[in-house]
């Protein structure tokens, strides 16, 4: 809490007026990050015109949030020493929420193409897991790769897989 107070340019007493302990602070930060991240990913996807652009926009939005505030990302993802009597895993909840939203977009695209939308859920969650894992590595072990380069690489991998498997499903349905 000393570090939080110092970063906020206030006293520890002022921080404790708003948060009883580090766990409550962690929960509040997670909730705010979830709100911002889900909003930014959704806006990015909604602003894209085709499925590949939607994937690229979502990946770029996620990486942009990390690049803009890597310390907040580390704080949320790597869970500081908090009281683990929490009933839920807030990071897993956030990842599931984003996975569900990506799955919804994929399902809509599959249905519009006349294909079965059933694979959308595992594909959406798989994509989110891939991006999160690559982002964790990118932030933990910087290699000089820019956010844009990483986004391009992840989009290429995701789109190659999605476009081929979607085409196969459509062929099987014919």
Predicted segments — roles?
Residues 74-77, 85, 170-171:
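Short, hydrophobic secondary-structure boundary micro-motifs
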Residues 1-24, 28:
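Helix-turn-helix
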Residues 35-38, 85-111, 119-136, 149-163:
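Amphipathic alpha-helical packing segments from all-alpha helical-bundle domains
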Residues 68-74, 107:
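Charged, amphipathic alpha-helical coiled-coil/dimerization segments
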Residues 112, 141-145:
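Transmembrane helix-loop junctions in multipass membrane proteins, especially transporters and channels
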Residues 165-174:
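C-terminal effector-binding regulatory domain of bacterial HTH transcription factors
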Residues 22, 116-120:
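Short glycine/proline-centered loop/turn elements that form peptide/ligand docking sites
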Residues 7, 24-47, 53-64, 75, ...:
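Alpha-helical structural segments
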């Amino acid at each position: 809490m000393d570090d939080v107070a110092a970063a906020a340019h206030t006293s520890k007493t002022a921080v404790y007026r708003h948060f009883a302990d580090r766990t409550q602070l962690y929960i509040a930060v997670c909730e705010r990050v979830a709100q911002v991240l889900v909003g930014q990913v959704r806006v990015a996807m909604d602003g894209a015109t085709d499925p590949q652009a939607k994937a690229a926009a979502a990946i770029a939005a996620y990486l942009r949030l990390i690049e803009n505030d890597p310390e907040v990302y580390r704080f949320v993802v790597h869970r500081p020493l908090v009281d683990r009597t929490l009933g839920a895993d807030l990071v897993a909840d956030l990842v599931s929420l984003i996975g569900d939203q990506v799955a919804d977009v994929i399902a809509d695209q599959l249905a519009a193409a006349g294909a079965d939308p059933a694979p959308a859920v595992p594909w959406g969650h798989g994509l989110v897991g891939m991006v999160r894992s690559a982002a964790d590595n990118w932030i933990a072990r910087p290699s000089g790769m820019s956010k844009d380069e990483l986004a391009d690489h992840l989009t290429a991998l995701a789109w190659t897989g999605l476009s081929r498997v979607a085409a196969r499903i459509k062929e099987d349905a014919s």
